[in-house]
C-alpha cells in the first residue's frame, strides 16, 4: 500500500525564477514572478486545505488555534497571574470565563496558555519528527548493520511504555518546558521512525534513487534531498499524529505538576485547578475550558490527518455510489 | 520460528535497556535516597552521622565502588527479587508494596482494556459496514473528538459529576471501613469504586480502537473476496464478520500491542485522579516523596509487564495471521 505523495505545499519556485528571468527589467519581472509563484503556492495550499470536508474542518480549527496563539496574548494584554479580589467567581461580563482561587481571570490564562501549549506541542512534534526522519531514512536507505542496529533500538523503544518512563525521567531533572519537551520527544519517536523506514525500504530500489547513485551523488544528499521530498506526505501525516500525542503527553505531565510553574499553559491550568480543588468548589469554568481546548485542537489535527489519508488513499473516501455499483454488480 | 526468536531477542533487549536506564537515572540525579531518609529521621530527632553511613550502606549509594561493581550488585539484587527499601513507606520493601497494589491495577486495567477493545472493534465493524450513513458520520465525528481528549481531564470531569450528583465514589479503591478479603461485601464495594475509573478509561480508549478498525475494515471491504462473497449470496452478517472483519482485525491486534504502553500510561493517570490504590498512584506518591527505589521498581514492573503483553500479542498475531508463521511478512 503506497499512498500517493501529495502535491508539495511549500513554495519552492522563487529560487528557480530568479535565474530564469531576463536581465534588463530584472527588478519588476522578478518580483512579479515571485508574486505569481507565491500566489500559485497559496492557491495550491488552498486547494489542499479545501480538498474535502474533513481537511477543511481540520484546517479551520487548527488555524484558529494558531492565530490565537500568535495574536491572542498581544490583543488582550493582561497579566494572566494578576490577582484580584473576585475569588472563584462564575463567568460574568467582567471575567468571561470566571476567576480561579487567586482571583486570576481564567479567560486571560486560557488565551495566554494557548501560546505555550500550541508552541510546545509544535516544537516537540518537530523534535520527534527530526529524530524519526533521521533514524527511519538513514536505517532504511543504508540497510545492513546500521539498519539492524537502528531497528533494534526502534523496536525496543516501541515496546517500552512512553508515559511512565517520561514521568520518572522528568522527575530527575529541573522542571521546565524544555525538559518536558526533550523527555516527551525522546519517548515518542519510534512509531514515526518505523513507518518511515518501511517507506524508505520501498523507495530505495526506485529508479530515481538508482540514477542519483549512478551520478555519484553523496549519500546524505540522496537520503535527504532525493528520498525525503518523496516521502513528505507520510512525514506530514505522522507529524500531525505525533503532534496530537505530544500535545496530550505534555499536558498530562504538566497536569501532574512537572511543568514550569512560572509559565501558564493548558496543562498547568489543569494542575492549578486540581491542586486548588476546583472540583469541590464546583468551579467548572476553571477546569473545563483548558481540557476542551486540548480536545478541540487534537480533534482538529486528527480531522486534518484523516482527511489527508482520504486524499491519499481513495478507498477510504465515503463514495456511496461506488459501493452501490459494487452491490449492483454483485446482485 | 526465526521471527519468534527475533521478537524474543528484542523483548529481552527492551528489558535490559529498562533495567539499565533504571540503574543510571537515580545516579544522574542530584541528592541521594539515604540523605532523604536521614533528613526525615532527623526531624524526629535521634540521629548521628553513623545513621547516615548505615543508611547509605543499606541503600548502596555514595559508595567508593566503581560504577560497574554497583551495576553488577544491582543486577544481582534484581535477580533475587530485591528492589530495595521504600523511603516513603520505610521500612517496607518495594516488592511488598508493589505486590499489595498490583491487584487493583491488574483488575481495573484488564477489565477496561478488554471491554474497550471489544466495544471499539464492534463499533468500527458496524460503522465501516454502514459507511456514509448518518450513523457513521455522527459516531466518527464524536469519536474523533474523544480520540484526542486529555485523559486526566476526562477523569476530572467524571469526578466533578460524581461529586455534584453524588452517584459514584470518586476516591479510594474500596470502602475503607471494610477489610480487604474474598467476601461479597468487599468485592461489591471494590467494583462500585472501580466503576468510574474504568468508565473513563474505556471512553478515552474506545475511540482509537473504533477508528483503527473502521479504516482497516473499509479497506478490506473493497477487496475482491468480499465482492465474491456478496456475489455468492452469503448472508450479510457472515460477510461482515467471517470475511471482512476477520481480515481487517489484524492492524487492530498490532495496534493493541502498541496501545498497551499508552493504556498503562492512562491507568497511571486514572489512579492519580481517583486516588485509586494501584501501582500508578503508588508511583506518583513515590515521585512526590522522592522515593527512588519505589519509583524505579514500579517503572521496571510496568515495562516488564508491557513487554510480556507484547509477547502474548505476538503469539496471538501469528495464530490470527498464517502469513507470519510462514515468514513471508516481516
Go through each PLM region and give its residues.
Chain A
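Transmembrane alpha-helices
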Residues: 115-131, 220-252, 301
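Glycine-rich helix-loop "coupling/hinge" segments at transmembrane-helix boundaries
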Residues: 158, 169-172, 199-200, 241, ...
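C-terminal transmembrane helix and the adjacent membrane-cytosol boundary/short C-terminal tail
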Residues: 184-187, 233-241, 284-331
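Short membrane-interfacial helix/loop motifs at transmembrane-helix boundaries
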Residues: 32, 70-108
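Generic hydrophobic transmembrane alpha-helix motif, especially the helices
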Residues: 96, 100, 127-131, 140-206, ...
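N-terminal signal-anchor/first transmembrane alpha helix
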Residues: 30-81, 150-153, 231-232, 298, ...
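Transmembrane alpha-helix signature in integral membrane proteins
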Residues: 106-141, 296-297
Amino acid at each position: 500500500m503506497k499512498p500517493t505523495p501529495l502535491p508539495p505545499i511549500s513554495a519552492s519556485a522563487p529560487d528557480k525564477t530568479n535565474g530564469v528571468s531576463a536581465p534588463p527589467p530584472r527588478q519588476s519581472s522578478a518580483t512579479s514572478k515571485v508574486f505569481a509563484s507565491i500566489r500559485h503556492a497559496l492557491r495550491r495550499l488552498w486547494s489542499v486545505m479545501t480538498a474535502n470536508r474533513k481537511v477543511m474542518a481540520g484546517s479551520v480549527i487548527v488555524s484558529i488555534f494558531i492565530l490565537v496563539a500568535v495574536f491572542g496574548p498581544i490583543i488582550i494584554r493582561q497579566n494572566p497571574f494578576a490577582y484580584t479580589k473576585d475569588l472563584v467567581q462564575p463567568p460574568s461580563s467582567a471575567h468571561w470565563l470566571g476567576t480561579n482561587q487567586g482571583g486570576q481571570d481564567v479567560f486571560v490564562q486560557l488565551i495566554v496558555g494557548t501560546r505555550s501549549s500550541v508552541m510546545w506541542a509544535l516544537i516537540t512534534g518537530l523534535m520527534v519528527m527530526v529524530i524519526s526522519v533521521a533514524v527511519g531514512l538513514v536505517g532504511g536507505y543504508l540497510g545492513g548493520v546500521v539498519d539492524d542496529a537502528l531497528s533494534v533500538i526502534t523496536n525496543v523503544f516501541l515496546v517500552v511504555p512512553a508515559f511512565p518512563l517520561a514521568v520518572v525521567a522528568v522527575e530527575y531533572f529541573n522542571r521546565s518546558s524544555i525538559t518536558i519537551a526533550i523527555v516527551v520527544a525522546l519517548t515518542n519517536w519510534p512509531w514515526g521512525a518505523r513507518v518511515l523506514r518501511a517507506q524508505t525500504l520501498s523507495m530505495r530500489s526506485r529508479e530515481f534513487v538508482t540514477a542519483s547513485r549512478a551520478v555519484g551523488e553523496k549519500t546524505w544528499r540522496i537520503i535527504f534531498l532525493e528520498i525525503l521530498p518523496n516521502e513528505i506526505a507520510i512525514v506530514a501525516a505522522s507529524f500531525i499524529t505525533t503532534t496530537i500525542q505530544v500535545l496530550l503527553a505534555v499536558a498530562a505531565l504538566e497536569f501532574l505538576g512537572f511543568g514550569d510553574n512560572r509559565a501558564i499553559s493548558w496543562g498547568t491550568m489543569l494542575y492549578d485547578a486540581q491542586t486548588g480543588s476546583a472540583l469541590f468548589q464546583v468551579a467548572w469554568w476553571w477546569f473545563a475550558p483548558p481540557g476542551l481546548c486540548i480536545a478541540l485542537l487534537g480533534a482538529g489535527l486528527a480531522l486534518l490527518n484523516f482527511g489527508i489519508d482520504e486524499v491519499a488513499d481513495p478507498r477510504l473516501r465515503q463514495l456511496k455510489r461506488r459501493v452501490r455499483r459494487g452491490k449492483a454488480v454483485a446482485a | 520460528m526465526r521471527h519468534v526468536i527475533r521478537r524474543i531477542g528484542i523483548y529481552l533487549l527492551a528489558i535490559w535497556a529498562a533495567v539499565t536506564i533504571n540503574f543510571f537515572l537515580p545516579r544522574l540525579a542530584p541528592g541521594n535516597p539515604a540523605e532523604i531518609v536521614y533528613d526525615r529521621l532527623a526531624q524526629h530527632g535521634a540521629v548521628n552521622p553513623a545513621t547516615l553511613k548505615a543508611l547509605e550502606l543499606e541503600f548502596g549509594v555514595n559508595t567508593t565502588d566503581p560504577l560497574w561493581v554497583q551495576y553488577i550488585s544491582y543486577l544481582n539484587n534484581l535477580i533475587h527479587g530485591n528492589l530495595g527499601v521504600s523511603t516513603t513507606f520505610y521500612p517496607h520493601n518495594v516488592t511488598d508494596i508493589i505486590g499489595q497494589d498490583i491487584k487493583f491495577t491488574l483488575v481495573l486495567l484488564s477489565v477496561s482494556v478488554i471491554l474497550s477493545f471489544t466495544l471499539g472493534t464492534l463499533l468500527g465493524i458496524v460503522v465501516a459496514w454502514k459507511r456514509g450513513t448518518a450513523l457513521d458520520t455522527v459516531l466518527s465525528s464524536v469519536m474523533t473528538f474523544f480520540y484526542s481528549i486529555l485523559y486526566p481531564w476526562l477523569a476530572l470531569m467524571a469526578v466533578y459529576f460524581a461529586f455534584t450528583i453524588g452517584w459514584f465514589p470518586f476516591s479510594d479503591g474500596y470502602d475503607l471501613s471494610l477489610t480487604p478479603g474474598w467476601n461479597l461485601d468487599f468485592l461489591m464495594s471494590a467494583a462500585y469504586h472501580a466503576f468510574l475509573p474504568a468508565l473513563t478509561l474505556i471512553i478515552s480508549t474506545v475511540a482509537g480502537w473504533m477508528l483503527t478498525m473502521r479504516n482497516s475494515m473499509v479497506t478490506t471491504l473493497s477487496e475482491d473476496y468480499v465482492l465474491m462473497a456478496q456475489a455468492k449470496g452469503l448472508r450479510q452478517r457472515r460477510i461482515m464478520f467471517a470475511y471482512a472483519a476477520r481480515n481487517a482485525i489484524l492492524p487492530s491486534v498490532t495496534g493493541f500491542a502498541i496501545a498497551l504502553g499508552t493504556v498503562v500510561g492512562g491507568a497511571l493517570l486514572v489512579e492519580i485522579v481517583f486516588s485509586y490504590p494501584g501501582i500508578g498512584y503508588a508511583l506518583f506518591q513515590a515521585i512526590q516523596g522522592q522515593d527512588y527505589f519505589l519509583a524505579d521498581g514500579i517503572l521496571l514492573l510496568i515495562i516488564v509487564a508491557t513487554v510480556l503483553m507484547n509477547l502474548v500479542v505476538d503469539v496471538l498475531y501469528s495464530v490470527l495471521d498464517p502469513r507470519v508463521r510462514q515468514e513471508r511478512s516481516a
